[in-house]
């Protein structure tokens, strides 16, 4: 009798284990044979480095991926055509690069997992259950920690913003800055014409001017005015990229685009293996590099530690 019970238990366990391993390997089999549609908004070195990291990461995971590349070169019509082809095709995954490609794909493609890259904001991705991605904007914590390494602690940070675009960001940044021992002064503008007076209000109020992505504040037309204000008032300006650093910003955070591609691949595999669940929220880049303008530091009489200068990817 006991022997009969043991046999029944063994059979039940065998059936259970078979089902578990069957489901596991079915998921792995699906993830290891992918047909990937890539929509590139533009052709540039950062886009190529990101795509290279994405491909390399999948290959390292022994994923057999067949890529079909749709290059839009900034043409909205080409993007729409690509999206329609993808919708009627048999694709496992869509990898979008740039806002032009991402916005169209998020609107039109609802039944295929989407991973997005080369975009600044994540608002639209958060509202799309089948999508995730890596945004270009660093987390507030990352930006302020970098500031701590380069500039004195306890300083007053100033920023200028348009509330429609960055109201929520500034509110969050103010709270985080305060928790890290900074004073925070933000000035809202409603038109580009408000910028000169906003800058002047900061002349005797802040120790550093923090540039945040804002289409009203930071433009090719306003850049000269902002950088001249920085030098004349000896208030360092923190830029958005090496182009800003080269033009006169004290420093800017830079991205490792290859690693962003690797991050996207990791998100893609997670998304594919958990398709019944909502996609995870988009994430910022995990690696922060930086460029420094040593000449600007000298003009502003700011001492930059030698290890910080040596760690920069570019020194001007």
Residue positions per predicted region:
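Short hydrophobic alpha-helices and adjacent helix-cap/hinge residues
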Residues: 3-13, 25-316
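Hydrophobic core
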Residues: 15-23
């Amino acid at each position: 009798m006991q022997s009969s019970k043991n046999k029944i238990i063994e059979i039940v366990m065998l059936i259970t284990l078979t089902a578990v391993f069957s489901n596991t390997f079915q998921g792995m089999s699906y993830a290891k044979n992918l047909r990937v549609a890539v929509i590139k908004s533009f052709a540039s070195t950062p886009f190529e480095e990101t795509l290279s990291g994405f491909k390399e990461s999948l290959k390292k995971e022994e994923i057999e991926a067949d890529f079909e590349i749709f290059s839009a070169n900034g043409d909205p019509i080409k993007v729409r055509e690509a999206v329609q082809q993808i919708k009627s095709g048999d694709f496992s995954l869509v990898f979008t690069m740039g806002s032009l490609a991402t916005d169209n794909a998020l609107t039109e493609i609802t039944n295929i997992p989407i991973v997005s890259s080369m975009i600044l904001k994540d608002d639209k991705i958060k509202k799309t259950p089948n999508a995730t991605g890596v945004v270009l904007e660093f987390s507030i914590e990352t930006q302020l920690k970098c500031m701590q390494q380069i500039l004195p602690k306890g300083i007053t940070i100033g920023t200028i913003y348009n509330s429609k675009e960055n109201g929520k960001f500034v509110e969050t940044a103010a709270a985080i800055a305060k928790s890290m021992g900074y004073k925070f002064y933000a000035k809202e503008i409603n038109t580009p014409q408000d910028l000169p007076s906003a800058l002047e209000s900061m002349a005797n109020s802040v120790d550093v001017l923090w540039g945040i992505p804002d289409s009203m504040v930071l433009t090719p037309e306003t850049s000269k005015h902002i950088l001249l204000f920085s030098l004349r008032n000896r208030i360092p300006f923190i830029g958005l990229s090496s182009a800003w650093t080269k033009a006169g910003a004290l420093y800017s955070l830079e991205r490792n685009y290859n690693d962003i591609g690797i991050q996207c691949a990791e998100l893609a595999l997670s998304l594919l293996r958990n398709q019944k669940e909502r996609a995870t929220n988009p994430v910022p880049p995990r690696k922060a590099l930086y460029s420094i303008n040593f000449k600007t530091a000298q003009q502003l009489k700011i001492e930059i530690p030698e290890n910080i200068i040596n760690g920069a990817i570019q020194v001007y």
